[in-house]
Amino acid sequence: MRKTSPKPDLDAYLRLNNASFEEWITALRVLSGCDDIKCRPHSGGGSIGSLSALDSARGRVISLKASKGIDVSGFRSTESVLLLPREGVPEIAIRGGLWRPLDRLLVLVPQDRFELRLAPGTKVMILRPEIGALGDWIAQSSDQCLSVLEAIVDCYLERLPFVRGDEQARQLTNRFFDTLATPWTPRKAAVCSERNLDRRLQRVVEKIMQDPAWEFDLKELASYAGVSERNLYYLMKRETGITPYRFYQRARLTRVRERLVDCQCEVPHISWYAADEGFSHLGRFAAMYREHFGELPSETVQWRRNLLRRSVASAEELVET
């Protein structure tokens, strides 16, 4: 059984959070390219969940997280699709078949129209390559090969929270899809086998992510991790590729993004949200935001506004009966 503890994954590319039914299904249609997707909530009212998405030239990675139980049907693709459970144990039904647990990586070919059943707190990653990005071999993968593929996907997702910015995130995503395009070899198992982050760095990550009020202090952070300041700096740089402060900065920017994504007011208070996270100069904040996420803060807000302006079908058409 897979470990299913909460994972940051695509938090930096959040598109919807605490979304209503209409917003969630419309966004999923837009991001997946499947206009006939339908969904059926297990109970009425309230937020459906969150959606994140990262695009690259070689493919798209989508994260679905349910805050309430929901069945989603109508998924299809012109290319093979990879599904990976990240939190909880979702269920899947393929070609109208019986529901079964989705408890490991699954590769689906274009004719595999499928449905997902998400319980509250369930999170699923959908990895959709561009046309021609994957080789034909991937749909015929053996159990051994699937285990290696899962390790490759896990390694990619574990590295994403530690990229320096948007450009590196997209480069990493391109390399990930390129890796999947070549036939499996034993070397991939050795190079991409999953490994845990050093426990001292795990403490650092938890401190930064779980204590929004904390102001950066390398000495305090090193003491918390149980290492010297110098060792912490070089340990994190070696293990993740970024410095402790860079990770702290990205975490603060991600928290601002979460508030912008949730914003439904007529005039978004971008400067207020930025100031709450310690960014006092709006111009520099906007530049850093774009460097990390590939868009300006105003564009994050505008994406949701554009979504709301779309011609969304009535609730009767969206909900399966």
Q: Over which residues does each language-model region extend?
A:
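Alpha-helical bundle regulatory/interaction domains
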Residues: 1-42, 81-82, 91-212, 218-219, ...
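Generic hydrophobic, amphipathic alpha-helix propensity
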Residues: 197-201, 248-253
